[in-house]
Amino acid sequence: ITHVAMDTHKKEHTVAVGYPGRDKPEILTVANTVVEIRRMVRRILKQAPGEVVFCYEAGCCGFALQRRIESYGGHCQVIAPSLVPVKRGEHVKTDRRDAIKLLTLFRAGLLTEVRAPDPQQEADRDLTRLRQSARENLQRVRHQILKLLGRHGYVYTDGDHWTVRHRNWMRSL
């Protein structure tokens, strides 16, 4: 089995390819574009003897990268970052080292795969998170407005805040 571990980022990925029988991995840097990902996957699938398995830590790429790799014929696992074993004293982090470390753990079978949601579940989850974030932002801004008014001596005492009556009172200031 050829193992491929990717340290993923928004703009580019560092890829460590562990071919069977080779101790030293091949290291690639790939732009995070459809064309470059396709080219990298096809190249590895062509060069590898037998099965190829890709992995990367869940994060900024979501599950789109997994779906893309699998659409090009590769098998890809998304790894739970919170369950990746960490050695004490490992403080120097580079993309290259992270990719090699992930490859080593992947080859040893020490990584835990997360279940990828289907695209509809992922879209629903994204929408729910965006809505929650918008609600929190709205609440924070409302508190900031009330604190600003209070610092300038304007305190509303005729009922609940953010009612039509309260908003009319603010407009009249």
What spans do the regions from the language model cover?
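Gly/Thr-rich phosphate-binding beta-strand-loop-beta motif of the actin/hexokinase/Hsp70
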Residues: 1-19, 102
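Short, glycine/acidic-enriched loop or turn micro-motifs at the edges of active sites
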Residues: 10, 60, 83
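Short, well-ordered alpha-helical microsegments
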Residues: 14, 62-66
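Glycine-rich phosphate-binding "P-loop"
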Residues: 20-35
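Short, basic/hydrophobic alpha-helical segments
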Residues: 34-53
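Acidic beta-strand-to-loop metal/phosphate-binding motif
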Residues: 50-59, 102
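Short alpha-helix plus adjacent loop in nuclease-associated cores
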Residues: 70, 76-129, 133, 166-173
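Glycine-rich, often acidic, oxyanion-interacting loops/wings at catalytic, nucleic-acid
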Residues: 128-173
